[in-house]
């Protein structure tokens, strides 16, 4: 029985995701599928539009057999940390044969070549990088030019400018770094770019779908999302549990910043950026506006988003030194095939499986990472318009199909 692993966010699940899932199954000829999925906060540095259990329902209805949560410390981090945490978790299951991911490039050999150079940093690459850095350009631009020089490929700039290619390269780096035996596959992304905000083409991006939902609701999305996604979103919105956006947390974040809660313990914060964020918090009470005030050529919006989310969730950079990847397997949902795989994982994986949250202290010698997931849910539910009770992880049932 071939087992396929994929890394997802499904924020929300749309037809492009369905295409990737079905094509991955055909390409790898795997009979079973495991998804490692971001929880209530995602890699863009913002809350998911609906909670992790609603998105697990979408995944299972689409044909995923087992959904495992990616710890929030990795789910909300840089592309490099996100990829490493997710790949390490997939590999730690010890049953995954194939791993399929989307990319704009769609060429595994080309992406692997780039990943190997970035991971191994051969002397000729380091020399070129050093030369370009001396000229005063940014590290990202220097890296791009150095790669272009050593690989002799004029498309490097184009490859490194798109989010799925960047993640694909990080996935391949992580597989190589941990010496994984999982076989990678990439599928060329179809339709709009991940960051596109326009609803158009055969497959619309998740960003454009979210924008449409916040501005106009669910009407007009039938062409871009499966019926089950629409039904799950509709039910969630009727219960006032979404759509959730970063703006819901504006007051909390502005309060923390005006109170000068230290930022220097957060990953990727420099002194100049810290002061700029503090100053901006006195000029607005809206987090989206704050990011526009801080954003510059040097400080990208993505970097600022990640800092704000880590401030909101109290995630400090020390946690990345304490752990080398996730130290548990948190199950969110499964079907009958998923149940079979869980039995195999229990036999083969060195990590404890958590299906009953109340038992986490007995199962984990270090509970810090898991408790961040619990806290993230408690923060997330503050955005609900009706009830914002804490401790939802302890009482929400597993999603079973």
Curated annotation (Swiss-Prot):
Q: Name one Pfam family in it.
A: HIGH_NTase1
Q: Which GO terms describe its molecular function?
A: ATP binding; ligase activity, forming carbon-nitrogen bonds; tRNA binding
**Gene3D superfamilies linked:** HUPs (3.40.50.620)
Which reaction(s) does the protein catalyse, per the Swiss-Prot or TrEMBL entry?
A: cytidine(34) in elongator tRNA(Met) + acetate + ATP = N(4)-acetylcytidine(34) in elongator tRNA(Met) + AMP + diphosphate
User: Signal sequence: where?
Assistant: none
Q: Which InterPro entries match?
A: Rossmann-like_a/b/a_fold (IPR014729), tRNA(Met)_cyd_acetate_ligase (IPR008513)
The protein's matches in SUPFAM superfamilies, at most eight in alphabetical order, are given as: Nucleotidylyl transferase
For this entry, list what GO says about its biological process: tRNA modification
Keywords, comma-separated and alphabetical? ATP-binding, Cytoplasm, Ligase, Nucleotide-binding, RNA-binding, tRNA processing, tRNA-binding
Record-level GO cellular component terms:
cytoplasm
Q: Which residues are connected by disulfide bridges in this protein?
A: none
Could you say which EC number(s) this protein's record lists? Answer: 6.3.4.-
Name the principal localization, coarsely classed. Answer: cytoplasm
Compartment(s): Cytoplasm
Instruction: Give me the residues that bind ATP, please.
Output: 7-20, 102, 164, 189
Q: Which family does it belong to?
A: Belongs to the TmcAL family.
Per its UniProt record, what PANTHER family does this chain match? TRNA(MET) CYTIDINE ACETATE LIGASE
Stated role = Catalyzes the formation of N(4)-acetylcytidine (ac(4)C) at the wobble position of elongator tRNA(Met), using acetate and ATP as substrates. First activates an acetate ion to form acetyladenylate (Ac-AMP) and then transfers the acetyl group to tRNA to form ac(4)C34.
Put simply, this protein is called tRNA(Met) cytidine acetate ligase
């Amino acid at each position: 029985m071939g087992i396929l692993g994929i890394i997802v966010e499904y924020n929300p699940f749309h037809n492009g995701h369905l295409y990737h899932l079905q094509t991955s199954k055909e390409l790898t000829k795997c009979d079973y599928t495991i998804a490692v999925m971001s929880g209530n906060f995602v890699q863009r540095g913002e809350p998911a539009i609906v909670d992790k259990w609603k998105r697990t329902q979408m995944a299972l209805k689409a044909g995923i057999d087992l959904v495992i949560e990616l710890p929030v410390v990795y789910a909300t981090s840089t592309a490099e940390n996100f990829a490493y945490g997710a790949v390490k978790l997939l590999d730690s299951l010890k049953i995954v044969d194939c791993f399929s991911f989307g990319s704009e490039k769609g060429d595994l050999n080309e992406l692997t070549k780039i990943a190997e150079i970035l991971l191994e940093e051969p002397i000729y690459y380091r020399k070129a990088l050093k030369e370009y850095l001396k000229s005063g350009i940014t590290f990202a631009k220097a890296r791009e030019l150095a790669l272009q020089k050593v690989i002799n490929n004029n498309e490097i700039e184009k490859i490194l400018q798109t989010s799925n290619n960047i993640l694909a390269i990080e996935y391949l780096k992580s597989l190589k770094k941990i010496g994984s035996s999982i076989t990678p596959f990439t599928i060329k992304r179809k339709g709009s770019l991940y960051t596109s905000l326009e609803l158009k083409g055969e497959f619309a991006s998740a960003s454009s779908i979210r924008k449409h939902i916040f501005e106009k609701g669910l009407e007009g999305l039938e062409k871009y999302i499966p019926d089950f996604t629409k039904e799950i979103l509709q039910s969630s919105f009727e219960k006032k549990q979404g759509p959730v956006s970063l703006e819901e947390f504006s007051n909390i974040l502005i309060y923390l910043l005006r109170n000068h809660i230290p930022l220097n313990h957060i990953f990727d914060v420099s002194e100049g950026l810290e002061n700029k964020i503090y100053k901006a918090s006195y000029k607005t009470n809206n987090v989206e506006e704050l990011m526009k005030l801080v954003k510059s050529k040097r400080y990208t919006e993505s970097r600022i988003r990640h800092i704000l989310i880590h401030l909101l969730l109290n995630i400090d950079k020390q946690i990345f030194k304490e752990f080398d990847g996730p130290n548990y397997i948190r199950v969110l949902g499964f079907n009958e095939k998923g149940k079979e795989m869980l039995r195999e994982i229990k036999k083969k994986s060195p990590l404890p499986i958590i299906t009953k949250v109340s038992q986490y202290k007995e199962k984990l010698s270090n509970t810090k990472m898991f408790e961040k997931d619990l806290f993230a849910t408690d923060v997330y539910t503050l955005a609900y318009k009706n009830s914002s009770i804490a401790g939802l992880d302890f009482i929400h049932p597993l999603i079973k199909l």
